[in-house]
């Protein structure tokens, strides 16, 4: 499966889930065959206000790559800023606008 320039070995993804998709969970999913894992939902507002708990959600390891980072928010300017902040944190950025 190919998403943009990202080539994945299979179509198995681990969905972004608040309170679930932390680093240990993602590592387990990778060990069990997930080609792509997602971060927990990360608040654009939390990044804007530089919240430690929000920043901690961005912790990752090489062995879980490729990693998708999911951002959520409802203010376009803050979402744009959040995208810039997490650009190097994963191979894919997913925007949750709902």
Regions found by a protein language model. Name each.
Residues 1-2, 17-91:
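Glycine-rich, positively charged N-terminal anion/phosphate-binding segment
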Residues 91-98:
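Short, flexible active-site-proximal loops enriched in glycine and acidic residues
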Residues 1-2, 6-12:
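Extreme N-terminal starter segment of soluble prokaryotic enzymes
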């Amino acid at each position: 499966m190919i998403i943009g320039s990202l080539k994945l070995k299979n179509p198995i993804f681990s969905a972004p889930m608040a309170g679930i998709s932390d680093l240990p969970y993602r590592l387990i999913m990778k060990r069990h065959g997930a080609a792509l894992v997602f971060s927990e939902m990360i608040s654009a507002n939390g990044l804007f206000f530089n919240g430690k708990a929000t920043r901690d959600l961005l912790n990752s390891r090489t062995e879980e790559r490729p990693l998708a980072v999911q951002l959520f928010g409802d203010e376009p300017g803050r979402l744009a800023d959040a995208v810039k902040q997490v650009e190097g944190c994963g191979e894919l950025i997913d925007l949750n606008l709902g």
